[in-house]
């Protein structure tokens, strides 16, 4: 535990009865009571997430957009100042180094939010590639905390609480603001499938903001949401988690994330490999499923088509919305034409549980 990092709000969460787990090298709140109740609170009301473990990287300089268009799969020319876009960072083989959100401050300044488990790796990767470009790469991860407020009532809550900061920001847009004298970024983005904001705050004011939203909550129940509910929320929404649905061994083609890839760009790292994979047409795919049983297949469990080994589970959990286990699985290309067959199973402790492939819960 000596090398495990703690959030700036660690003691705050302790005082709110948080139970902790270790994730991506951080000691994180996994729940504050019932993770199912926390999940449904976000679906029906609103919830607060401390995701200060996420990494922040600033790219700045006259060739910042050229650099990012080379190292990322999406086209940064598609967005204007004040807009955000999802993208992937691939290796030469088309595998995904990380998935991230890019916030365009200006044509020569971009703010990246990257996964905590990859933050250091991403920063070093970008540093090794930036030399030919007239721009700089700065790691701001230690400088910023990140609080997310998500749910159908999140927008009204924050607009009423701090209207000067949260009004008139559209989805996938953000605003650079001075909050209590500190440069902050307020983004209408999220990882739950619900509307809401993600607020990047300097660590000097993140505690003040957390106390403000907590004391202003109209509910007597805790509004703070842990990692367990965050994972079930993203599974229902169909969002990928790096190291599961995507990795350096799983490409955007296989993960069905080509909407985050602009193959029309002149060049970017991984483009040739992705084009070749599409031409070969032998790739497997990541599919969402529901289990026809109460037991939950976990990551690494074998997926069978009849008695044939056909894939593996990448994520598994319980969906409070459909009240059943759901998950994702990588299915080998030879079996994809049979995905509507009723003869699919996932193995749990030697038992074969029937599964059916479907759209993510929130997209049905």
Predicted regions and their residues:
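Acidic, proline/glycine-enriched N-terminal capping motif
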Residues: 1-87, 95-97
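Glycine-rich, acidic
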Residues: 6-10, 21, 27, 130, ...
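Short glycine-/aliphatic-rich beta-strand segments at the starts of folded cytosolic domains
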Residues: 47-73, 140-159, 281-291
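Helix N-cap motif at beta-to-alpha junctions
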Residues: 62-63, 115-120, 152-155, 202-207, ...
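Short amphipathic alpha-helices in soluble, non-transmembrane regions
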Residues: 71-72, 124-131, 161-162, 209-217, ...
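Glycine-centered loop/turn motifs
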Residues: 81-85, 119, 167-176, 298-300, ...
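Glycine-rich, small/acidic residue-mixed loop/short-helix segments
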Residues: 250-364
